[in-house]
Swiss-Prot record:
Regulation (activators, inhibitors): Activity is inhibited by the phosphodiesterase PdeR. Inhibition is relieved by high cellular c-di-GMP levels.
Record-given protein name: Diguanylate cyclase DgcM
Organism name: Escherichia coli (strain K12)
Quaternary structure and partners: Forms homodimers and homotetramers. Interacts with PdeR and MlrA.
Record note on disruption phenotype: Loss of curli fimbriae, decreased biofilm formation, decreased expression of DgcC, a probable diguanylate cyclase and of the curli regulator CsgD.
GO molecular function, one term: metal ion binding
Domain of life: Bacteria
Positions with a binding annotation for Mg(2+): D291, E334
Domain GGDEF: 283-410
Cofactor(s) in the UniProt record: Mg(2+)
Active site: E334 (proton acceptor)
Reactions that this protein is recorded to catalyse: 2 GTP = 3',3'-c-di-GMP + 2 diphosphate
Site (Transition state stabilizer): K296
Amino acid sequence: MITHNFNTLDLLTSPVWIVSPFEEQLIYANSAAKLLMQDLTFSQLRTGPYSVSSQKELPKYLSDLQNQHDIIEILTVQRKEEETALSCRLVLRKLTETEPVIIFEGIEAPATLGLKASRSANYQRKKQGFYARFFLTNSAPMLLIDPSRDGQIVDANLAALNFYGYNHETMCQKHTWEINMLGRRVMPIMHEISHLPGGHKPLNFVHKLADGSTRHVQTYAGPIEIYGDKLMLCIVHDITEQKRLEEQLEHAAHHDAMTGLLNRRQFYHITEPGQMQHLAIAQDYSLLLIDTDRFKHINDLYGHSKGDEVLCALARTLESCARKGDLVFRWGGEEFVLLLPRTPLDTALSLAETIRVSVAKVSISGLPRFTVSIGVAHHEGNESIDELFKRVDDALYRAKNDGRNRVLAA
């Protein structure tokens, strides 16, 4: 990472964060931004109680930002020792030809931009005109909301009534916080949206339907004046199926298909320096490397399906022995890894012995009992993860050479 002089940004009264999208690493925050962060990390700003975005992962914004699309996120920040919402405009810049960054610029709306009290209690949609035709014929669910009346829904088109499962009268007795799973926490977010310039902004929420079920939605919401009333128009798109597919793909990317455990790729992601700091396991942790003894013999003699049964049974045993906070990975083949946060060597050795004994008791129909050998190592000083893994691998190698079915420390 090339170091740049960002100190001139401290002259700005609006908060600015400069973030590396791929690691979600904060490169710089100006003075105004630091005041709003207190002791929070940037990731916590994006995942707080008032945080709303259209993308969970920052790299997914890159294409739209390159095409100069207007993207807004709402962060959870600290003001006067209280959490509140802050809208940010996202801009893509390059520190070098190969080093893109995303700038989060806080949009501090003047008080005079707020939506003033409307006359929406007397609102009645006219039967003719452009708005009536647009509202009635649109196939997307549309809600008209009055922020000045506690988020009262004052109108809904037929698509919205069909989507939420209410008749028009009942729908217009509800407030936006009654259909949003954030509850009243959505109110500061709604008021932030009411200040945003430049049209409607896509943000993701979870909405509750009349039958009690929930749907993931992407909403385009922004201020609008209709018949003299200052309101908010919210266009709703159901993205539940899209979210389900994204979650399935994300799970498949991070987990082993056969055992359901975390995979080697996720191990290296978690053990990146920035991730280790976030998980508070940067120093005091231990590693177990577990290998199934004579696994090739099991495959050759009893078949690969029985070998798969052994691996799945071993995976379940490791999960049952693991403590809260321990992470279990399938490393590949018949090898597994346990990452033990805040665990000294003697505790790691004790847990490894518990695993060894437990595995020896596992019974699978049509198979003799099987055993494991385990290497154990505790992270030392500034040791890299590769250096640590070499030590634990050497310990496992010695355990196998010394007769298998045993635990050895590096």
